[in-house]
């Protein structure tokens, strides 16, 4: 009888953990508009962290970098090489800040979800989580990427950019148009799904085996979070490069 009660209690606990309250959000009322405050709060925290890092590491620049300046220059060189590889030697420079901003924001957001216990901060409704754990954030980033590669193509080719939709044959016009909708969808849902799944798995494991299993899973989550940031930035740069070079 005790075993049955224990199993029933365990099942109830798992059901509570797996129940994601998708409709529960914390809103700010601004005039006649409701602003989704949860993702704004955590996004501002990430922005402050990145701004603080930039300020601290660049306030005393030296010809021979040391410490934080050396680290930031290494990150910048990595982002520059990634952008140059995907966009091309001649066109990549103006896009380094955009790709770098995407990569760093997603990277720090993902890691904040794995390292910072957002849920200990109580809200009237819903709960805090990593910015990229919210579909609003990932869709916004994907739409920014879409605007960027449309701008890149139109800026370089003018109205002739739209000729790519009928290449290599006009029969592919519907497919090429559909592709422009699937790109932001795939970017946003891939990032959102991976981060949400990682946080749910860690939460379940912590409830079942609090001390042993969650530690390696957290390291795996950190690795996955870094990879997702790299994938998003790489694909964004690739889409921009493709829009300027034509149909690949």
From Swiss-Prot:
Q: Which InterPro entries match?
A: ATP_syn_F0_a_bact/chloroplast, ATP_synth_F0_asu, ATP_synth_F0_asu_AS, F0_ATP_A_sf
Query: In which compartments does the protein localize?
Result: Plastid, Chloroplast thylakoid membrane
Please give the Gene Ontology molecular function terms for this protein. proton-transporting ATP synthase activity, rotational mechanism
User: Where would you find the membrane-spanning parts of this chain?
Assistant: 37-57, 96-116, 135-155, 200-220, 221-241
Assigned keywords, A-Z:
ATP synthesis, CF(0), Chloroplast, Hydrogen ion transport, Ion transport, Membrane, Plastid, Thylakoid, Transmembrane, Transmembrane helix, Transport
| GO annotations of cellular component type | chloroplast thylakoid membrane; plasma membrane; proton-transporting ATP synthase complex
Please report the record's description of how this protein sits within the membrane.
Answer: Multi-pass membrane protein
- Is the keyword 4Fe-4S assigned to this protein? no
Protein's job: Key component of the proton channel; it plays a direct role in the translocation of protons across the membrane.
What does the subunit section of this Swiss-Prot or TrEMBL entry state?
Answer: F-type ATPases have 2 components, CF(1) - the catalytic core - and CF(0) - the membrane proton channel. CF(1) has five subunits: alpha(3), beta(3), gamma(1), delta(1), epsilon(1). CF(0) has four main subunits: a, b, b' and c.
To which protein family does this belong?
Answer: Belongs to the ATPase A chain family.
**Protein name as catalogued:** ATP synthase subunit a, chloroplastic
From which source organism is this entry? Psilotum nudum (Whisk fern)
């Amino acid at each position: 009888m005790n075993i049955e009660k224990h199993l029933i209690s365990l099942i109830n606990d798992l059901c509570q953990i797996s129940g994601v309250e998708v409709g529960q959000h914390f809103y700010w009322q601004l005039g006649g508009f409701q602003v989704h405050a949860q993702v704004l709060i955590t996004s501002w925290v990430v922005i402050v962290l990145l701004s603080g890092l930039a300020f601290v590491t660049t306030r005393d620049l030296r010809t021979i970098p040391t410490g934080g300046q050396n680290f930031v220059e290494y990150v910048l060189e990595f982002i520059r090489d990634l952008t140059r590889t995907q966009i091309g030697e001649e066109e990549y420079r103006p896009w380094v800040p955009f790709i770098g901003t995407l990569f760093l924001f997603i990277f720090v957001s993902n890691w904040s979800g794995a390292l910072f216990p957002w849920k200990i901060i109580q809200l009237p409704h819903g709960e805090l989580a990593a910015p990229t754990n919210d579909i609003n954030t990932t869709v916004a980033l994907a739409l920014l990427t879409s605007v960027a590669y449309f701008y890149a193509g139109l800026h370089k080719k003018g109205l002739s950019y739209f000729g790519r939709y009928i290449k290599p044959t006009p029969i592919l016009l519907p497919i090429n148009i559909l592709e422009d909708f699937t790109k932001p969808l795939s970017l946003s849902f891939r990032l959102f799904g991976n981060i949400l799944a990682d946080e749910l798995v860690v939460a379940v494991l912590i409830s079942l085996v609090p001390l042993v299993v969650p530690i390696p899973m957290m390291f795996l989550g950190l690795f996955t979070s870094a990879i997702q940031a790299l994938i998003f930035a790489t694909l964004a740069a690739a889409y921009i490069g493709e829009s300027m070079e034509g149909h690949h």
